[in-house]
């Protein structure tokens, strides 16, 4: 999973405002809402129902990973609470979503040992602190959003020094719908089409427009991989998840539909380059694609004289 071969408006950010469906009454206590929002924030949504479907996707398709995902999310949330970080941001899931992905990655990539749970807790807590530093510096002058950068940086560090467990790739059905579903499932390191279906339902409940863009991104990514002769990667969804995330990041720019399309194209183009790294690229193509677009948007909005001045600052 997430290997290269199987063997917001102008500044896209994670959601901090409620995005609940119409007439939805949230029955969860605050801590559960924060956790579920952490799962949905992986998809750049704030919606506990969406988060619940993401949780179910993991539970039904890879139950052995659910403990790591919950542990990573809890570590991020409790670290934020212990350190007195902004409560609104905690409830929005901003301190949990990187922990979710870190818990999934470490549970999948590393063999079980007594050190694995403490490692997930430490990595999840560290991701929370990195997000906080990023949020502290956010403002009018902040160009780049954090996205899943803490997850990627911590994940790369652990994979470089750790000893990943052996994994075998099962034969995949050459089915276009299954490939599309896997493209969404791989966002959570899941290669089961059922996982992708549940994630798609969660996205539809949170934001139908965003769901449509995510599906389009996954479809374009898989199609490009097929055309490029990467059939195995295409049917595994490995060219779909970064494109889907890039589309989600710019899906709210309704008056500029070319932005999510450009984000999708950049994410797909960057994926083969990042495949040359000694570790899996994870969500780095998505992050870099969005950062390039954000830098470009900032440069275009800045007056020419001011841009020239900044070259020497």
What are these regions (language model features)?
Residues 143-195:
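Long hydrophobic alpha-helical segments that form multi-pass transmembrane helix bundles
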Residues 59-71, 110-123, 183-192, 231-240:
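Structural signature of hydrophobic alpha-helical transmembrane segments
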Residues 92-166:
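Membrane-interface helix-loop-helix junctions at boundaries between adjacent transmembrane segments
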Residues 2, 14-85, 158, 183-190, ...:
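N-terminal signal-anchor module of multipass membrane proteins
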Residues 86-101, 141-145, 211-212, 216, ...:
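Short, non-helical or kinked segments that cap or interrupt transmembrane helices
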Residues 117-118, 141-150, 236-241, 277-289:
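Loop-to-transmembrane alpha-helix initiation sites
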Residues 150-154, 213-221, 259-271, 286-289:
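Central hydrophobic cores of alpha-helical transmembrane segments
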Residues 75-88, 128-139, 199-206, 246-252:
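C-terminal ends of transmembrane helices
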């Amino acid at each position: 999973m997430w290997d290269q071969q199987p063997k917001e408006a102008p500044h896209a950010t994670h959601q901090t405002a409620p995005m609940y469906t119409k007439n939805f009454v949230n029955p969860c206590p605050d801590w559960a809402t924060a956790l579920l929002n952490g799962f949905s924030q992986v998809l750049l949504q704030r919606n506990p129902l969406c988060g619940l479907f993401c949780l179910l996707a993991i539970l039904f398709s890879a139950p052995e990973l659910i403990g790591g995902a919950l542990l990573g999310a809890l570590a991020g949330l409790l670290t934020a609470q212990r350190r007195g970080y902004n409560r609104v941001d905690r409830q929005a899931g901003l301190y949990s979503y990187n922990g979710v992905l870190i818990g999934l990655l470490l549970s999948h990539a590393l063999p079980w040992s007594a050190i694995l749970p403490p490692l997930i807790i430490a990595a999840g807590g560290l991701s929370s602190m990195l997000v906080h530093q990023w949020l502290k510096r956010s403002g009018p002058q902040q160009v780049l959003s954090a996205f899943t950068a803490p997850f990627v940086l911590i994940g790369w560090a652990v994979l470089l020094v750790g000893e990943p467990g052996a994994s075998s790739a099962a034969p995949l059905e050459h089915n276009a719908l299954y490939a599309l579903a896997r493209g969404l499932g791989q966002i959570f390191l899941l290669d089961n089409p059922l996982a992708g279906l549940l994630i798609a339902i969660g996205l539809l409940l949170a934001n139908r427009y965003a769901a449509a863009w995510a599906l389009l991104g996954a479809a374009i990514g898989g199609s490009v991989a097929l055309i490029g002769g990467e059939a195995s990667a295409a049917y595994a969804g490995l060219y779909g998840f970064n494109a889907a995330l890039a589309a989600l990041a710019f899906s709210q720019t309704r008056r500029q539909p070319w932005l999510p399309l450009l984000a999708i194209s950049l994410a797909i183009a960057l994926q083969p380059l990042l495949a040359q790294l000694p570790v899996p690229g994870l969500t780095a193509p998505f992050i870099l694609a969005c950062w390039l677009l954000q830098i470009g948007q900032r440069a275009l909005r800045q007056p020419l004289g001011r841009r020239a001045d900044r070259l020497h600052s």
